Amino acid sequence: MDAEAGSLEEEELELFAMLIDEYESEKFPIELPDPIDAIFFRMDQEGLKQKDLVKYIGSQSKVSEVLNRKRPLSLSMIRKLHRGLGIPAEVLLEEEGGELPAPHEGLNDYPFTEMYKRGYFGFFNGALTEAKEIKEELLTRFFSIFQGMTFTKALPRTSDANKMDEFALEAWQARALTLAEDEEYPPYQLGSLSEDDFKYLVSLSAFANGPLLAREYLQKHGIPFVILKSLPKTYLDGACFKSPSGRPMIALTLRHDRLDNFWFTLLHELAHLYLHLDENNFVFFDETESPLTESELHDPKEKEANGLASKVLIPENEWDLWRSAIGKYVSKADINAFAHSLGISPAISAGRLRWETGDYKKYSAMLGNKAVKKLFQEN
């Protein structure tokens, strides 16, 4: 006999039924269907053949491998099967309550093949063809190093002729962060660097292994210093940004394997760290070989970084006195003597002279060509 609607007996029965459902769910949970079984079930329902799955899975051979459980479902396949056959995402993902992640923006805009060749996906051991089939999964895992952190891109310093590829820059930055995370550093103390530290770093340029000593000095101060080859179409010499933990770091590409470029780029990025990085979550990407563009001339951050780097490398009063005393014709001996008086590498003074005169044919032998990369393990 049914309980009367709205009666106490009906409420007790409803509560009893709910308790039974909860008990059964807890003690006898219903497992999700197997994703391949679910595909076969939908094929049977819809009267589909294997060839009908090509548009979801990619090719006849891939369909066969998936249905024979010899190939895992990729996110791309799962999305198409979910939309096309209506199979719940949690079934295809084999995850109770699982939801498909939003597709990675610009998935096909990253230099994926170059990233693979350079070992950016060190956690993956398959061939390039296999990597391309799970591109989204690999890129999602690779960019997880950012931990959801977003950066305010400062105006990239680059020539008008060279437009930096934003996707390649993002990939390069993620790789630099990954390499930095592989090392251990002491805590970074905010404001611990001073201009005296900068001057000490410049003094290290007098030594053949000065770049290595500079990296060691910065890392002892809790600042990662990464050397990472630039990706195509980035035109990148150096960068400065924070890790997700808030630790500032420097990364150089050694695109121009010269001592003068190394020391100027390093001091330029350190100037950004010292002057600008605490203000916001900035990332600075710099091409330091080209003159400032018209827009950069009006960017105070680039002008300030240039000014501090130049001042620390060679004090303005010392430079002006030397230039007025030496006259128009400057010999290699003059450059060596001036550098020796300052306790710095002659490459720095030779590079400054070439920059100011615009005569890049002179003093090439004094710039420390191919003297930097050989000191570092290339990444």
Q: Where do the model's predicted regions map?
A:
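Short, flexible active-site-proximal loops enriched in glycine and acidic residues
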Residues: F28-P35, L48-Q60
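DNA major-groove recognition helix of helix-turn-helix/homeodomain DNA-binding modules
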Residues: S76-V91
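Recognition helix of helix-turn-helix/homeodomain-like DNA-binding domains
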Residues: I57-L73
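N-terminal flexible/basic segments that precede or flank functional cores
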Residues: M1-A38, Q45
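Alpha-helical residues within helix-turn-helix
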Residues: K51-D52, K80, A337
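Short amphipathic helical patch at the helix-1/turn junction of helix-turn-helix
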Residues: M43-D44, P72
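Residue-level signal for the short linker/turn that defines the boundary of a DNA-recognition helix
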Residues: L48, G58, L73-S76, A333
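Active-site hotspot residues in diverse enzymes, especially metal/ion-binding acidic/histidine motifs
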Residues: E11, E24, I30-P35, F41, ...
